[in-house]
Protein backbone atom coordinates (compact mmCIF):
# COMPACT_ATOMS: atom_id res chain seq x y z
CA UNK A 1 0.00 0.00 0.00
CA UNK A 2 1.36 3.36 -1.01
CA UNK A 3 1.50 6.07 1.64
CA UNK A 4 1.74 9.75 0.76
CA UNK A 5 4.08 11.92 2.80
CA UNK A 6 4.17 15.66 2.53
CA UNK A 7 7.55 17.00 1.45
CA UNK A 8 8.46 18.32 4.91
CA UNK A 9 7.45 14.97 6.48
CA UNK A 10 9.47 12.73 4.19
CA UNK A 11 12.36 11.05 5.96
CA UNK A 12 15.60 12.79 5.02
CA UNK A 13 18.78 10.81 4.35
CA UNK A 14 21.24 10.80 7.20
CA UNK A 15 23.89 13.46 6.74
CA UNK A 16 27.50 12.19 6.53
CA UNK A 17 28.66 15.35 8.28
CA UNK A 18 29.86 15.10 11.86
CA UNK A 19 29.42 18.41 13.73
CA UNK A 20 31.21 17.06 16.79
CA UNK A 21 34.44 16.97 14.77
CA UNK A 22 34.24 20.74 14.33
CA UNK A 23 33.63 21.17 18.07
CA UNK A 24 36.65 18.96 18.78
CA UNK A 25 38.76 20.95 16.32
CA UNK A 26 37.76 24.23 17.99
CA UNK A 27 38.59 22.89 21.46
CA UNK A 28 41.99 21.61 20.34
CA UNK A 29 42.68 24.89 18.54
CA UNK A 30 41.85 26.92 21.64
CA UNK A 31 43.49 24.83 24.35
CA UNK A 32 46.79 24.08 22.62
CA UNK A 33 47.56 27.78 22.28
CA UNK A 34 46.88 28.60 25.93
CA UNK A 35 47.91 25.72 28.17
CA UNK A 36 51.48 26.06 29.41
CA UNK A 37 52.23 29.16 27.34
CA UNK A 38 54.26 32.10 28.63
CA UNK A 39 53.44 35.71 27.84
CA UNK A 40 55.04 36.38 24.47
CA UNK A 41 54.48 40.04 23.69
CA UNK A 42 55.15 43.16 25.73
CA UNK A 43 51.47 44.15 25.39
CA UNK A 44 50.46 40.95 27.19
CA UNK A 45 52.86 41.64 30.03
CA UNK A 46 51.60 45.22 30.35
CA UNK A 47 47.93 44.21 30.39
CA UNK A 48 48.58 41.44 32.89
CA UNK A 49 50.42 43.91 35.15
CA UNK A 50 47.50 46.35 35.02
CA UNK A 51 45.06 43.56 35.86
CA UNK A 52 47.10 42.62 38.91
CA UNK A 53 47.35 46.30 39.86
CA UNK A 54 43.54 46.61 39.88
CA UNK A 55 43.27 43.83 42.45
CA UNK A 56 46.11 45.31 44.48
CA UNK A 57 45.19 49.01 44.66
CA UNK A 58 41.48 48.72 43.68
CA UNK A 59 41.58 51.61 41.19
CA UNK A 60 38.77 50.23 39.06
CA UNK A 61 37.66 53.40 37.30
CA UNK A 62 41.16 54.45 36.20
CA UNK A 63 43.67 51.59 36.63
CA UNK A 64 47.21 52.73 37.36
CA UNK A 65 50.55 50.95 37.32
CA UNK A 66 53.34 52.77 39.16
CA UNK A 67 51.16 55.91 38.97
CA UNK A 68 50.83 55.59 35.17
CA UNK A 69 47.11 55.50 34.19
CA UNK A 70 45.75 53.13 31.58
CA UNK A 71 44.42 55.34 28.77
CA UNK A 72 44.58 53.08 25.71
CA UNK A 73 40.83 52.52 26.02
CA UNK A 74 38.28 52.12 28.75
CA UNK A 75 39.29 49.60 31.46
CA UNK A 76 36.48 47.23 30.43
CA UNK A 77 38.83 44.41 29.47
CA UNK A 78 40.91 44.95 32.59
CA UNK A 79 37.77 44.65 34.71
CA UNK A 80 36.96 41.28 33.21
CA UNK A 81 40.56 40.15 33.57
CA UNK A 82 40.58 41.14 37.24
CA UNK A 83 37.24 39.44 37.89
CA UNK A 84 38.36 36.24 36.18
CA UNK A 85 41.59 36.27 38.17
CA UNK A 86 39.73 36.93 41.43
CA UNK A 87 37.22 34.14 40.79
CA UNK A 88 39.38 31.44 39.21
CA UNK A 89 42.45 32.09 41.32
CA UNK A 90 40.87 33.11 44.60
CA UNK A 91 38.06 30.57 44.69
CA UNK A 92 39.28 27.70 42.49
CA UNK A 93 43.04 27.97 43.00
CA UNK A 94 43.95 28.36 39.31
CA UNK A 95 47.17 30.29 38.68
CA UNK A 96 46.57 34.03 38.11
CA UNK A 97 48.09 34.08 34.62
CA UNK A 98 46.20 31.02 33.44
CA UNK A 99 42.99 32.49 34.85
CA UNK A 100 43.32 35.51 32.55
CA UNK A 101 44.23 33.28 29.61
CA UNK A 102 41.09 31.24 30.26
CA UNK A 103 39.09 34.44 29.79
CA UNK A 104 40.43 34.65 26.23
CA UNK A 105 39.49 31.00 25.66
CA UNK A 106 35.93 31.51 26.87
CA UNK A 107 35.41 34.68 24.83
CA UNK A 108 36.78 33.05 21.67
CA UNK A 109 34.46 30.08 22.22
CA UNK A 110 31.49 32.46 22.36
CA UNK A 111 32.79 34.17 19.21
CA UNK A 112 32.86 30.89 17.29
CA UNK A 113 29.32 30.09 18.43
CA UNK A 114 27.90 33.50 17.48
CA UNK A 115 29.70 33.64 14.13
CA UNK A 116 28.45 30.15 13.34
CA UNK A 117 24.89 31.19 14.17
CA UNK A 118 25.33 34.34 12.09
CA UNK A 119 26.59 32.32 9.13
CA UNK A 120 23.61 30.02 9.43
CA UNK A 121 21.23 32.98 9.65
CA UNK A 122 22.69 34.66 6.57
CA UNK A 123 23.42 31.70 4.31
CA UNK A 124 21.22 28.87 5.54
CA UNK A 125 21.42 25.52 7.28
CA UNK A 126 24.91 23.95 7.67
CA UNK A 127 26.65 27.14 6.56
CA UNK A 128 27.49 28.05 10.14
CA UNK A 129 29.97 25.17 10.28
CA UNK A 130 31.64 26.45 7.14
CA UNK A 131 31.89 29.92 8.67
CA UNK A 132 33.60 28.65 11.81
CA UNK A 133 35.95 26.42 9.81
CA UNK A 134 37.08 29.35 7.65
CA UNK A 135 37.64 31.57 10.69
CA UNK A 136 39.69 28.92 12.50
CA UNK A 137 41.81 28.55 9.37
CA UNK A 138 42.74 32.25 9.20
CA UNK A 139 46.31 33.02 10.24
CA UNK A 140 45.37 36.25 12.00
CA UNK A 141 42.88 34.54 14.30
CA UNK A 142 45.64 32.25 15.57
CA UNK A 143 47.45 35.29 16.94
CA UNK A 144 44.27 36.95 18.15
CA UNK A 145 42.78 33.94 19.88
CA UNK A 146 45.66 32.92 22.13
CA UNK A 147 46.86 36.12 23.76
CA UNK A 148 46.00 38.28 26.73
CA UNK A 149 44.42 41.03 24.70
CA UNK A 150 41.19 43.05 24.47
CA UNK A 151 40.88 42.10 20.79
CA UNK A 152 38.80 38.94 21.46
CA UNK A 153 36.25 41.23 23.12
CA UNK A 154 36.30 43.46 20.04
CA UNK A 155 35.65 40.39 17.93
CA UNK A 156 32.83 39.53 20.35
CA UNK A 157 31.17 42.88 19.66
CA UNK A 158 31.43 42.27 15.91
CA UNK A 159 30.11 38.72 16.35
CA UNK A 160 27.08 40.00 18.28
CA UNK A 161 26.56 42.69 15.65
CA UNK A 162 26.65 40.14 12.82
CA UNK A 163 24.33 37.75 14.65
CA UNK A 164 21.76 40.48 15.29
CA UNK A 165 21.76 41.55 11.64
CA UNK A 166 21.24 37.94 10.57
CA UNK A 167 18.22 37.46 12.87
CA UNK A 168 16.77 40.92 13.48
CA UNK A 169 13.69 40.31 11.28
CA UNK A 170 12.72 37.32 13.46
CA UNK A 171 13.26 39.06 16.79
CA UNK A 172 11.07 41.58 18.62
CA UNK A 173 12.16 45.14 17.93
CA UNK A 174 13.12 45.82 21.55
CA UNK A 175 15.27 42.67 21.86
CA UNK A 176 17.06 43.22 18.55
CA UNK A 177 17.65 46.91 19.24
CA UNK A 178 18.95 46.28 22.75
CA UNK A 179 21.37 43.59 21.56
CA UNK A 180 22.59 45.80 18.73
CA UNK A 181 23.13 48.68 21.16
CA UNK A 182 25.10 46.38 23.47
CA UNK A 183 27.31 45.34 20.54
CA UNK A 184 28.06 48.99 19.73
CA UNK A 185 28.74 49.80 23.38
CA UNK A 186 31.08 46.83 23.74
CA UNK A 187 32.99 47.95 20.65
CA UNK A 188 33.30 51.43 22.15
CA UNK A 189 34.59 50.17 25.49
CA UNK A 190 37.25 48.08 23.76
CA UNK A 191 38.33 50.19 20.78
CA UNK A 192 36.98 53.69 21.49
CA UNK A 193 35.05 55.87 19.03
CA UNK A 194 36.44 54.98 15.55
CA UNK A 195 35.08 51.42 15.45
CA UNK A 196 31.66 52.57 16.66
CA UNK A 197 31.65 55.29 14.01
CA UNK A 198 32.25 52.70 11.28
CA UNK A 199 29.61 50.31 12.67
CA UNK A 200 27.00 53.05 12.84
CA UNK A 201 27.80 54.27 9.32
CA UNK A 202 27.63 50.68 8.06
CA UNK A 203 24.25 50.19 9.74
CA UNK A 204 22.90 53.38 8.17
CA UNK A 205 24.39 52.56 4.76
CA UNK A 206 22.33 49.37 4.65
CA UNK A 207 19.24 51.56 4.38
CA UNK A 208 20.34 52.30 0.79
CA UNK A 209 19.22 48.77 -0.08
CA UNK A 210 15.49 48.34 -0.56
CA UNK A 211 15.38 45.07 1.39
CA UNK A 212 17.05 46.67 4.42
CA UNK A 213 15.01 49.87 4.23
CA UNK A 214 11.97 48.65 6.13
CA UNK A 215 10.08 49.76 9.21
CA UNK A 216 11.33 46.91 11.39
CA UNK A 217 15.01 47.60 10.73
CA UNK A 218 14.64 51.36 11.18
CA UNK A 219 12.95 50.87 14.56
CA UNK A 220 15.70 48.43 15.57
CA UNK A 221 18.30 51.12 14.82
CA UNK A 222 16.40 53.72 16.84
CA UNK A 223 16.14 51.39 19.83
CA UNK A 224 19.84 50.55 19.48
CA UNK A 225 20.75 54.24 19.69
CA UNK A 226 18.45 54.63 22.69
CA UNK A 227 20.38 51.94 24.59
CA UNK A 228 23.85 52.67 23.21
CA UNK A 229 24.10 56.30 24.33
CA UNK A 230 23.30 55.66 28.03
CA UNK A 231 25.61 52.63 28.11
CA UNK A 232 28.67 54.55 26.95
CA UNK A 233 27.72 57.50 29.16
CA UNK A 234 28.24 55.43 32.31
CA UNK A 235 32.03 55.33 32.13
CA UNK A 236 32.39 58.72 30.43
CA UNK A 237 30.23 60.39 33.08
CA UNK A 238 32.09 58.74 35.94
CA UNK A 239 35.43 59.78 34.45
CA UNK A 240 34.20 63.34 33.93
CA UNK A 241 33.30 63.58 37.61
CA UNK A 242 36.39 61.88 39.05
CA UNK A 243 39.18 62.37 36.47
CA UNK A 244 38.22 65.14 33.99
CA UNK A 245 41.83 65.81 32.95
CA UNK A 246 42.52 62.16 32.15
CA UNK A 247 39.19 61.92 30.30
CA UNK A 248 40.24 64.81 28.06
CA UNK A 249 43.63 63.19 27.49
CA UNK A 250 41.95 59.88 26.63
CA UNK A 251 39.62 61.58 24.16
CA UNK A 252 42.39 63.51 22.43
CA UNK A 253 44.63 60.47 22.01
CA UNK A 254 41.98 57.87 21.13
CA UNK A 255 39.13 59.60 19.35
CA UNK A 256 40.85 59.01 16.00
CA UNK A 257 39.14 61.87 14.20
CA UNK A 258 41.69 64.53 15.20
CA UNK A 259 44.52 62.73 13.41
CA UNK A 260 42.53 61.30 10.51
CA UNK A 261 42.81 64.06 7.89
CA UNK A 262 46.49 64.96 8.60
CA UNK A 263 47.45 61.30 8.32
CA UNK A 264 45.80 60.64 4.94
CA UNK A 265 49.03 61.25 2.92
CA UNK A 266 50.89 58.90 5.25
CA UNK A 267 48.23 56.23 4.85
CA UNK A 268 48.38 56.53 1.07
CA UNK A 269 52.17 56.17 1.13
CA UNK A 270 51.94 52.98 3.20
CA UNK A 271 48.92 51.46 1.46
CA UNK A 272 50.98 48.54 0.16
CA UNK A 273 52.13 47.72 3.70
CA UNK A 274 48.54 47.47 4.96
CA UNK A 275 47.36 45.46 1.96
CA UNK A 276 50.26 43.04 2.35
CA UNK A 277 49.62 42.44 6.05
CA UNK A 278 45.87 42.18 5.62
CA UNK A 279 46.29 39.62 2.84
CA UNK A 280 48.50 37.56 5.16
CA UNK A 281 46.42 37.71 8.32
CA UNK A 282 43.10 37.20 6.49
CA UNK A 283 44.39 34.23 4.47
CA UNK A 284 42.59 32.11 3.23
CA UNK A 285 39.30 33.91 3.98
CA UNK A 286 39.97 36.77 1.56
CA UNK A 287 40.62 34.35 -1.31
CA UNK A 288 37.31 32.57 -0.66
CA UNK A 289 35.56 35.94 -0.44
CA UNK A 290 37.05 37.01 -3.78
CA UNK A 291 35.94 33.77 -5.44
CA UNK A 292 32.44 34.20 -4.00
CA UNK A 293 32.24 37.78 -5.28
CA UNK A 294 33.18 36.64 -8.79
CA UNK A 295 30.64 33.80 -8.76
CA UNK A 296 27.69 35.81 -7.42
CA UNK A 297 28.55 39.25 -8.81
CA UNK A 298 25.06 39.60 -10.26
CA UNK A 299 23.57 39.29 -6.76
CA UNK A 300 25.86 41.74 -4.96
CA UNK A 301 23.24 44.47 -4.91
CA UNK A 302 20.03 42.54 -5.49
CA UNK A 303 20.46 40.30 -2.44
CA UNK A 304 20.54 42.11 0.92
CA UNK A 305 22.98 39.66 2.52
CA UNK A 306 25.55 39.95 -0.26
CA UNK A 307 25.17 43.72 -0.12
CA UNK A 308 25.98 43.58 3.59
CA UNK A 309 29.00 41.34 2.98
CA UNK A 310 30.45 43.77 0.42
CA UNK A 311 29.96 46.70 2.79
CA UNK A 312 31.63 44.68 5.56
CA UNK A 313 34.69 44.04 3.41
CA UNK A 314 35.07 47.68 2.35
CA UNK A 315 34.51 49.15 5.80
CA UNK A 316 36.68 46.53 7.47
CA UNK A 317 39.58 47.36 5.18
CA UNK A 318 39.16 51.09 5.79
CA UNK A 319 39.05 50.59 9.57
CA UNK A 320 42.16 48.43 9.63
CA UNK A 321 44.07 51.08 7.68
Describe the role of every protein-language-model region:
Residues 1-31, 219-227:
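Start-transfer (signal-anchor) and selected internal transmembrane alpha helices
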Residues 28-29, 47-72, 76, 83-86:
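Extracytosolic helix-loop segments that constitute the early lumenal/periplasmic catalytic or substrate-binding loops
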Residues 50-53, 189-190, 195-321:
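Transmembrane-lumen/periplasm boundary regions of multi-pass, lipid-linked membrane glycan transferases
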Residues 98-122, 160:
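Transmembrane-helix motifs of polytopic, lipid-linked glycan transferases
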Residues 120-126, 161-179, 183-187:
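Membrane-interface transmembrane helices that cradle and orient dolichyl/undecaprenyl
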Residues 131-136, 184:
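Short helix- or helix-capping micro-motifs
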Residues 140-154, 191-193:
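Short acidic/glycine- and proline-prone juxtamembrane loop motifs at membrane-interface regions
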Residues 142-143, 175-192, 316-321:
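Membrane-interface alpha helices of multi-pass inner-membrane proteins
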Amino acid sequence: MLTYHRLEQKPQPKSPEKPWLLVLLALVWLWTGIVGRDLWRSEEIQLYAYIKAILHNEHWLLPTLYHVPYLNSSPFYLWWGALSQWFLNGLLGISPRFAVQLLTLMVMSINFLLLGLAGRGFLGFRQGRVTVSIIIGCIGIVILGHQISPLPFLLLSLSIYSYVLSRYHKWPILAAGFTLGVAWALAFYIANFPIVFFLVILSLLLLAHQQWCNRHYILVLLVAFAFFLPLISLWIGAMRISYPLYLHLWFVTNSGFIYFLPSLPKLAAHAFYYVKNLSWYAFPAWILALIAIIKVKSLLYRDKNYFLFCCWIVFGFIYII
